[in-house]
């Protein structure tokens, strides 16, 4: 899994 990709996905969901 790509941690950066997941972080970006989560950040996108939070915003």
Curated annotation (Swiss-Prot):
Gene Ontology CC terms: extracellular region; membrane; other organism cell membrane
GO molecular function: toxin activity
Cell location: Secreted; Target cell membrane
Keywords: Antibiotic, Antimicrobial, G-protein coupled receptor impairing toxin, Immunity, Innate immunity, Mast cell degranulation, Membrane, Secreted, Target cell membrane, Target membrane, Toxin, Transmembrane
Tissue specificity comment: Expressed by the venom gland.
Gene Ontology biological process: defense response to bacterium; innate immune response
Keyword presence, Secreted: yes
Family of the protein in this entry: Belongs to the MCD family. Eumenitin subfamily.
Role description: Cationic linear alpha-helical antimicrobial peptide. It exhibits inhibitory activity against both Gram-positive and Gram-negative bacteria, and moderately stimulates degranulation from the rat peritoneal mast cells. Its mast cell degranulation activity may be related to the activation of G-protein coupled receptors in mast cells as well as interaction with other proteins located in cell endosomal membranes in the mast cells. Binds preferentially to charged lipid membranes as compared with zwitterionic ones.
Name under which the protein is recorded: Eumenitin
Organism: Eumenes rubronotatus
Source organism phylogeny: Eukaryota, Metazoa, Ecdysozoa, Arthropoda, Hexapoda
């Amino acid at each position: 899994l790509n941690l950066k990709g997941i972080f970006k996905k989560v950040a996108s969901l939070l915003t």
